Amino acid sequence: MEDQLTIFIISDSLGETAKAIAKACLSQFPGHDDWHFQCFSYINSQERLEQVFEEASQKTVFMMFSLVDVALASYAQKRCESEHYAYVDLLTNVIQGISRISGIDPLGEPGILRRLDNDYFKRVESIEFAVKYDDGRDPRGILQADLVIIGISRTSKTPLSMFLADKNIKVINIPLVPEVPVPKELRMIDSRRIIGLTNSVDHLNQVRKVRLKSLGLSSTANYASLERILEETRYAEEVMKNLGCPIINVSDKAIEETATIILEILKTNGQVAKNL
């Protein structure tokens, strides 16, 4: 229709936030479907704003702008008022109110929320990576990982991988088993990207018995025997020594405590610093 009602979304970033607010508000008017969205992204100068108003001149327009630049937002308000456009400034009053109460000046940088969204998606990617390569499912992931955690069974490899993935670090964990050759990829990367985990024999004996019980198996199985645990522990320590990687004993440590130690080691070694 010629007099179609149009919402102009004017933003110094993508305009997704403003559009989401507009849609939420329009849901209160279910009987009216003549609204049309027109999004103007990355409006960062008065010249570009002028072009938006030129386009609005022949339409019935409601202006919604999300501009962190105070001068630009003020200009948009004045133009709307002088040309009798209905409008709402989504950011100025909120930012000024927060600044007044907190005593902190705003950054005035457009696109910050978008950068935060990018961090979120990177974190999701890291978590998906940890799940995909959990428990050595595909050793080729070693070459793509920021961090490789190695250790025998029940040394908290998986929960640590997930915890660190939430810190935006791509982690793969590799189980060390005497009968299984060490992945060749471990010798193809910087040993500072590898962390070895150990545990006390007594603690491993206890947690493995609990694990067997949860699976409905006998606690006397070889998996939980002291002889087997000693064999695995000696083998793992020899592998870690040959690789020259840092080793952490996780006995009596919470996941968060071990993760903090790992993060400090990575920072000291200059590894994955971009994520920390």
UniProtKB/Swiss-Prot annotation:
Enzyme superclass (EC): transferase
Residues noted as binding ADP in the record, renumbered to the chain: G151, I152, S153, R154, T155, S156, K157, T158
Pfam families named in the record: Kinase-PPPase
E.C. numbers: 2.7.11.32, 2.7.4.27
Top-rank lineage group of the source organism: Bacteria
Catalysed conversion reaction: N(tele)-phospho-L-histidyl/L-threonyl-[pyruvate, phosphate dikinase] + ADP = N(tele)-phospho-L-histidyl/O-phospho-L-threonyl-[pyruvate, phosphate dikinase] + AMP + H(+); N(tele)-phospho-L-histidyl/O-phospho-L-threonyl-[pyruvate, phosphate dikinase] + phosphate + H(+) = N(tele)-phospho-L-histidyl/L-threonyl-[pyruvate, phosphate dikinase] + diphosphate
One Gene Ontology term of the molecular function aspect: ADP binding
InterPro entries hit by this protein: Kinase-pyrophosphorylase, PPDK_reg
Key words of the record: Kinase, Nucleotide-binding, Serine/threonine-protein kinase, Transferase
PANTHER family in alphabetical order: PYRUVATE, PHOSPHATE DIKINASE REGULATORY PROTEIN 1, CHLOROPLASTIC
Stated family: Belongs to the pyruvate, phosphate/water dikinase regulatory protein family. PDRP subfamily.
Purpose: Bifunctional serine/threonine kinase and phosphorylase involved in the regulation of the pyruvate, phosphate dikinase (PPDK) by catalyzing its phosphorylation/dephosphorylation.
Name assigned to this protein: Putative pyruvate, phosphate dikinase regulatory protein
